[in-house]
Amino acid sequence: RFFKMDYKIRIVRYLYFFSFVSLLILYLFPGSLIGYLFYGDFSRQPDIIPNPLGTSINHTIAFFYLSILGLISYMRGTSFKQTLIFLVVVSLILELSHLIIPNRSFQYSDLFANLLGTLLAIVIIFLYKRLKNGKI
């Protein structure tokens, strides 16, 4: 079945899985790898986009990106709903893992930002499907 799938969807799935593994590494590492790359300091979180929300915007962007890839990857099959549930559960588990990982801290604002990124992706996919089917 995998080899019969459209090559564009296959590329999106590869990108989704690569992005998911990258997100796991970034989330579960005790400290900020990106902070180390930018500032030489594992304890510093960079702001991708300067804003009043601080680093939580990074979470929204990351989960929006991951959710868009995941939902596009499985848009045609029954796995769409399973992918959606998976993304929400991963969001919760990853942020809760910061309670036990050294040099990381659980923050409700980050959890909200994770879920917001996933929700924005769902809305965009929903609107795209309706537009594609001529219902908008």
Label the model's feature ranges.
Residues 2-109, 115, 119-136:
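Bulky hydrophobic segments
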